[in-house]
Amino acid sequence: LTPLEGMKAEYLILNGAECEPYLTSDYRLMTEHAQEILIGGEMMRRVLGDVAGIIGIEENKPKAIEIMKKLTSNYLQWEVVPLKKRYPQGGEKQLIDAVLGRKVPSFSLPISTGAVVQNVGTAYAVYEAVQKHKPLITNVLTISSSDTSIQKNYRFRIGTPIREFLSAAGAMDKEGNLSRAFAKVV
């Protein structure tokens, strides 16, 4: 959160736009832990020097937008920006352009636009670390099959073997082989 010497942050953008079309882990965090995300975001915003806070969420997530708008309504420093559903909207440079209308120049860092971008999951992790004294040892992962018959979110410890992810999602057959729907994705 410390910008390079000579660069100053004007905005903290919390990225609530999933980077891939079938991911839903950020959406679930925003609908289930919105208050914690906002508290973690507020901590980061203040560390950056009381900059403006923006939460970018794709418009195909109306429940998350509604929840976050309701929460931020009491904070003058925060704004929720609904974003067009466009791949890869969750990319850092694309998000800055969509939210601020500023392009990150080639061979430059995002801070050159005055923006610091953090994921909503990072804001949640900051809350957990500072308020609950919990280290970041888990992450939420979406497991989705190509035919979308399986689409679930799981919280796993960092370093968990991929076979355990797939087994938990029901992607393995009785012999321990990957099911056909998942074989296309993995």
Where are the regions that the model predicts?
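Histidine-anchored nucleotide/phosphate-binding helix
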Residues: T31-V47
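Mid-sequence acidic-hydrophobic segments that form the walls
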Residues: N15, M44-V47, L71
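Short alpha-helix boundary/capping segments
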Residues: S25-E36, R157
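Beta-strand/loop-dominated core regions that host nucleotide or nucleotide-derived cofactor-binding catalytic loops
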Residues: A181-V185
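Hydrophobic alpha-helical hairpins/lids featuring a short glycine-rich hinge
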Residues: L1-L14
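Hydrophobic alpha-helical positions that pack around
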Residues: T2-L4, D50-I162, A168-L178
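Gly-rich Lys/Arg/Thr-decorated short loops/hinges at beta-loop-alpha junctions or inter-strand turns
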Residues: L12-D26, D147
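Metallocofactor- and cofactor-centric catalytic cores in central/energy metabolism, strongly enriched
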Residues: D26-T31, V47-D50, G56
